[in-house]
Regions:
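Glycine-rich, small/acidic residue-mixed loop/short-helix segments
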Residues: 71-242
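Short Gly/Pro-enriched turn/cap motifs at secondary-structure boundaries
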Residues: 6-8, 126-128, 176, 263-266
Length: 269
């Protein structure tokens, strides 16, 4: 059995097992005996959407505008393609190089090469009513859009999540659940993070936003949902001005340092 620290879910702790076909049933039955719970493709699809992972036929392959979706339209391409000299030449290298250079310029808000990468896949969050579905047209109120679609939803659904209490390191995952409609969209490359959009859902335009990510994996063993409309934490109450509190803290640190230097005996051999 080969075990790889890879996956298609975005979870910080997860593995893929590779075994001979003849052994697959044994491993399946054994994992079930040990408490594993099987899930269907629907669960996998919601997880990969949360992690902004592409799926062929949605974020890769044919585009609804005609032609194929460029490789560098998918954010993960920057990790998958190498132009190192030792790689040598390969089929498609020149085209990928043009896309890569356009991608770099676009990241710096330089759209001079946008013709080589006119659209990109980006995560979107629906703040209005409804559920995102593949093919829904996306609009922008910016003048340059001229009222025309600036892209379309490539993947979308309603996804459950566990609600949390507290902030930062004190965050606690509760048993209470919520739902949110998120997805991925193929958008004009001039659109970037925090861009306000409108998505046509069965004839009604609903507000949406481009986000950096739907989940974060910084605190294993669980991912945390990122909710753009989550209220910001209240600023900590402080009776004294910050400058005075900082000065008092520095004074305490200095006194502690002198105490350790001159009034303590080092008992460590």
């Amino acid at each position: 059995v080969r075990i790889a620290k890879t996956g298609y879910t975005g979870e910080p702790i997860g593995y893929e097992l590779y075994c001979e076909s003849r052994d697959a049933r044994y491993f399946w039955d054994r994992l079930i005996e040990l408490g594993a719970r099987p899930t269907a493709l629907g669960a996998r699809d919601t997880l990969r959407m949360e992690a902004s992972l592409p799926l062929y036929g949605h974020e890769m392959g044919e585009c609804e505008f005609g032609g194929e979706i460029p490789v560098y339209a998918v954010p993960l391409a920057k990790f998958a393609v190498s132009f190192a000299e030792e790689k040598g030449d390969f089929i498609g290298r020149a085209a990928l190089k043009r896309q890569f250079e356009a991608f770099q310029r676009i990241m710096n808000r330089d759209y001079s090469a946008i013709a080589d990468l006119p659209y990109r896949i980006q995560p979107v969050y629906l703040s209005g009513k409804g559920v995102l579905r593949k093919g829904f047209p996306v609009y922008s109120k910016d003048a340059w859009a001229e009222g025309k679609p600036v892209g379309y939803v490539t993947s979308g659904t309603m996804i459950p999540y566990f609600k949390t209490e507290g902030e930062g390191l004190e965050t606690v995952i509760t048993s209470e659940t919520g739902k949110r409609s998120i997805g991925l969209a193929y958008l004009d490359s001039r659109i970037c993070q925090d861009f306000d959009l409108e998505i046509d859902i069965r004839g009604k335009r609903q507000p949406a936003k481009v986000v950096a990510w739907h989940i974060r994996q910084d605190a294993a063993p669980y991912v945390r949902p990122i909710l753009p409309d989550h209220p910001a934490p209240a600023a900590p109450h402080c009776d004294a001005p910050y400058a005075e509190k900082a000065a008092a803290l520095l004074k305490k640190a200095q006194e502690n340092h002198l105490w350790r230097q001159h009034r303590c005996i080092n008992l460590i051999p």
